Amino acid sequence: MMSVPETPSHAAPQATFETLTAERIAELVAIERLAYSHPWTARNFADSLQAGYNCQLLVAGATLLGYFVAMQGVDEVHLLNITVAPQAQ
């Protein structure tokens, strides 16, 4: 019979999704500048929030790992931005 390995006490925090708030836009802009030669601006993210787009952050504890911005269509979803922080790639 095989046993399930125990999770080490030093295991990384579980990654979860959180909804983007305006207060966290500066964090995304910093990652955009590291990840892309033509990054989104703070205004792009603010406009996406105002338009009601689905803006989600992937976090592990206090660490921002990545994010996406998606626009719901009739029977589809348009992925407008998806980014993994360079340090998490």
Question: Where on the chain are the PLM-derived regions?
Answer:
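Acetyl-CoA-dependent GNAT
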Residues: 2-89
